[in-house]
Amino acid sequence: MKKITAGILADLQKASAENPRRRTNYNLHEQLDDPIQRLCIMGEPDTVFPVHRHLGKWELACMMKGSLTLYIYNDDGSIREQIDMAPGGDTLVVEIPADTWHNYILHEPGTAFMEVKRGPYKPFGPEELAGFKGVTPEKH
């Protein structure tokens, strides 16, 4: 059985604070080529998630700790939707449709969420990274 414990979250928070990217993740899947990717992402408010999309793949985000805003964009870079997420808040889980431009802004140190999506993992290709910047921590 796999678990994400309070101790694991504490270790992830320390690691994310020390990481130059200001975030880290804890994989529940065994291999990067697993058919379903399952990971806990822990980050700090100054981490930058580039605006991206997953071609042909949905993404499920489930809040665990802290708070964030999920931004959904139109193809021209305008904001289509902004969803605030936090444990105990109105929105805890969001399924982002395939091919949807999005990014996250974290509001609290040690914000954690689970991400589930179809694998295998592959780095973003140019068609999956937006040609616009979107909302960034300094613009929020």
Feature map (PLM): residue ranges:
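Short beta-strand His + acidic residue motifs that chelate non-heme Fe in jelly-roll/DSBH
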Residues: 51, 70-71, 94-96, 102-107, ...
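Glycine- and acidic-residue-biased ligand/ion/polar-headgroup-sensing regions
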Residues: 56-76
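Double-stranded beta-helix
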Residues: 11, 78, 103-140
